[in-house]
């Protein structure tokens, strides 16, 4: 008897273990939205807390959270900063992971008042949910003058910079600016002023005074960075608008042109004169006077420093990150100050000889600044044209560097010239493809010929009109990143297109998420996107063939072969 019971238990365990072998290959491994983003709320008079418990491997979009009161008045809702998430099609977006708590202050609520909360999220594995809407019933709240102020929102992890350069680049840029013709010749004079004309100071004392001077200059730049970053944080949404991005790109281009010598960009001479007089009144050789001199020097922008400084300030405004803003400008000032400290301690013998090379350094920084408008315009014009702009910039830079290097007389420069010429030839490739139609030829194969449907009735009618042919239904939305990946990487593959040659292709665009879209998704029992359904010649779906989440071309082709009879 015991042996029979043991055998039965073993059989049951074996059944459960091997059951997974027979799971449908298209079966969704994703949980419903209510499990991925468990929503809850709690009200205590004027204070309402909205909470989301976010499942591991999932995230909510910050910009997709909307709160609308009905028969109630609430204070401005302050969404906490999230962490940056990047994808190929939407760039960088702020998201929330793990848990989100959102305090809402209710100033007044009538009986029966509600709060409509809309949010949307995705899974890391490439699966996005339609926007979810929850209705929060509110307890009656009487308005009074003592209503609490909006609750400060706990900050999540500060987002990192969303621009192409790290703050450490500012240190290198500062060092490079020190070798431009407007700055390098001034260092011996500045060194003498800082030391107060005293040539007998000890090395430690001279280094200390110079360090204090650099810190004064860094203080000014850091303050500028903090102010600009704070302003950028307030207008960060506006700074992402295409018109604003185009305007900033034009400004960056003008700044680069000033580095090329087309015009001079600096503070008005009257203001520069006043600042110089204020600096001259300070006593050199004393820590306090030297610090003030450095702080004032940070405001006196020469023609060589104005454009890079302006570019860095606009870069910081785009990031909206105060830590990044202050730190970037501090490192920039420190980079400019390092050569001054070395000259003060070791003397002018460390200075390289002046010459045309300093103008070339200035021109090189013009190309560095030109990289920023290309980065900004790439968000507006897309990847293809962005690649062409990067190509044009690369050809211009390496071509200029190659022509400049021809003036060199040293033998080893021949190797550098070969490298620069090769880099220019590599950079020009995207422009060649564009000019000779290679890109156009590739793009002619990128799209399947889908028939669009909107409602359940249209789907049923399309299944009838298929006349015995198999049908594939692709559920698509603009907010679904993986749907765009399917279009670009999977549906464009020749093997996939060949496998679908005898299949009727339907597509439902549910971007609007309106009543018809919701009804269609509910009818098909779809949790989120991307989801691809397959129907036989009789109009019956094959649930085991359903695809949820992204598949590359090879995997999807194998899936298509497996579903064939």
From Swiss-Prot:
InterPro entries xrefs: Cyt_c_assmbl_TM_dom, DsbD_gamma, DsbDN, DsbDN_sf, Thiol_diS_interchange_DbsD, Thioredoxin-like_fold, Thioredoxin-like_sf, Thioredoxin_CS
Top-rank taxon: Bacteria
Entry-linked SUPFAM superfamilies: Thiol:disulfide interchange protein DsbD, N-terminal domain (DsbD-alpha), Thioredoxin-like
Mutagenesis / variant outcome for changing residue 182 to A: Loss of activity
Membrane topology, from the record: Multi-pass membrane protein
Outcome after substituting residue 301 to A: No loss of activity
Keywords: Cell inner membrane, Cell membrane, Cytochrome c-type biogenesis, Disulfide bond, Electron transport, Membrane, NAD, Oxidoreductase, Redox-active center, Signal, Transmembrane, Transmembrane helix, Transport
Known catalytic reactions: [protein]-dithiol + NAD(+) = [protein]-disulfide + NADH + H(+); [protein]-dithiol + NADP(+) = [protein]-disulfide + NADPH + H(+)
EC number per UniProt: 1.8.1.8
Gene Ontology molecular function terms on file: electron transfer activity; protein-disulfide reductase [NAD(P)H] activity; protein-disulfide reductase activity
Cytoplasmic side: 184-207, 264-295, 344-356, 405-417
Membrane spanning stretches: 163-183, 208-228, 243-263, 296-316, 323-343, 357-377, 384-404, 418-438
Record's keyword annotation contains Signal: yes
Chain ranges on the Periplasmic side, renumbered to this chain: 20-162, 229-242, 317-322, 378-383, 439-565
One BP term from GO: response to copper ion
Primary location class: membrane
Extra remark beyond the main annotation: The consequences of replacement of the cysteines with alanines were found to depend on the conditions tested and on the reporter system used for the analysis, and then differ depending on the references.
Function noted in UniProt: Required to facilitate the formation of correct disulfide bonds in some periplasmic proteins and for the assembly of the periplasmic c-type cytochromes. Acts by transferring electrons from cytoplasmic thioredoxin to the periplasm, thereby maintaining the active site of DsbC, DsbE and DsbG in a reduced state. This transfer involves a cascade of disulfide bond formation and reduction steps.
HAMAP family recorded: DbsD
Family label: Belongs to the thioredoxin family. DsbD subfamily.
Record-given protein name: Thiol:disulfide interchange protein DsbD
Species this chain originates from: Escherichia coli (strain K12)
Source lineage: Bacteria, Pseudomonadati, Pseudomonadota, Gammaproteobacteria, Enterobacterales
């Amino acid at each position: 008897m015991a042996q029979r019971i043991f055998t039965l238990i073993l059989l049951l365990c074996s059944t459960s273990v091997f059951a997974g072998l027979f799971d449908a290959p298209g079966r969704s491994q994703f949980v419903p939205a209510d499990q991925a983003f468990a929503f809850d709320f709690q009200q205590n008079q004027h204070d309402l807390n909205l909470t989301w418990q976010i499942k591991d491997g999932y995230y909510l979009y910050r910009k997709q959270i909307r709160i609308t009161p009905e028969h109630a008045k609430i204070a401005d809702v302050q969404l906490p900063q999230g962490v940056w998430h990047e994808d190929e099609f939407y760039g960088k977006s702020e998201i929330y992971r793990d848990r989100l708590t959102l305090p809402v202050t209710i100033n007044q609520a009538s009986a029966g008042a509600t709060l409509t909360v809309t949010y949307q999220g995705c899974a890391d594995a490439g699966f996005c949910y339609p926007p979810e809407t929850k209705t929060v019933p509110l307890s009656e709240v009487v308005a009074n003058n003592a209503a609490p102020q909006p609750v400060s929102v706990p900050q999540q992890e500060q987002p990192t910079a969303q621009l192409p350069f790290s703050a450490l680049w500012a240190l290198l840029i500062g060092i490079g600016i020190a070798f431009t013709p407007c700055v390098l010749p001034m260092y011996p004079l500045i060194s003498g002023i800082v030391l107060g004309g005293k040539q007998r100071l000890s090395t430690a004392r001279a280094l200390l005074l110079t360090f204090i001077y650099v810190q004064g200059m860094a203080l000014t730049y850091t303050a500028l960075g903090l102010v600009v970053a704070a302003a950028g944080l307030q207008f960060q949404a506006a700074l992402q608008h295409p018109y604003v991005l185009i305007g900033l790109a034009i400004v960056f281009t003008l700044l680069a042109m000033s580095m090329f010598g087309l015009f001079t960009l600096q503070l008005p001479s009257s203001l520069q004169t006043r600042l110089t007089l204020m600096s001259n009144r300070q006593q050199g050789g004393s820590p306090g006077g030297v610090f003030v001199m450095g702080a004032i020097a940070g405001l006196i922008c020469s023609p060589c420093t104005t454009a890079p400084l302006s570019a860095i300030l606009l870069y910081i405004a785009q990031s909206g990150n105060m830590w990044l803003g202050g730190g970037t400008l501090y490192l920039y000032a420190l980079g400019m100050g390092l050569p001054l400290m070395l000259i003060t301690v070791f003397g002018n013998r460390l200075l390289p000889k002046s010459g045309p090379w300093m103008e070339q350094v200035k021109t090189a920084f013009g190309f560095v600044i030109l990289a920023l408008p290309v980065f900004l315009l790439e968000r507006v014009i897309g990847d293809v044209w962005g690649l062409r702009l990067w190509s044009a910039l690369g050809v211009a830079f390496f071509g200029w560097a190659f022509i400049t290097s021809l003036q060199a007389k040293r033998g080893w420069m021949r190797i550098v010239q070969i490298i620069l010429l090769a880099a220019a030839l590599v950079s020009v490739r995207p422009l060649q493809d564009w000019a000779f139609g290679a890109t156009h030829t590739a793009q002619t194969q990128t799209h399947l010929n889908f028939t669009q449907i909107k409602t359940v009735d249209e789907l049923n009618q399309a299944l009838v009109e298929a006349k015995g042919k198999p049908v594939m239904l692709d559920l698509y939305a603009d907010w679904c990143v993986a749907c765009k990946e399917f279009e670009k990487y999977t549906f464009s593959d020749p093997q996939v297109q060949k496998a679908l040659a005898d299949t009727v292709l339907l597509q439902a665009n549910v971007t609007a998420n309106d009543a018809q879209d919701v009804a269609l998704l509910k009818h098909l029992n779809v949790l989120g996107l991307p989801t691809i359904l397959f129907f036989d010649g009789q109009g019956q779906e094959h649930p085991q063939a359903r695809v949820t989440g992204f598949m590359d071309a090879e995997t999807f082709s194998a899936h298509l072969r497996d579903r064939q009879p």
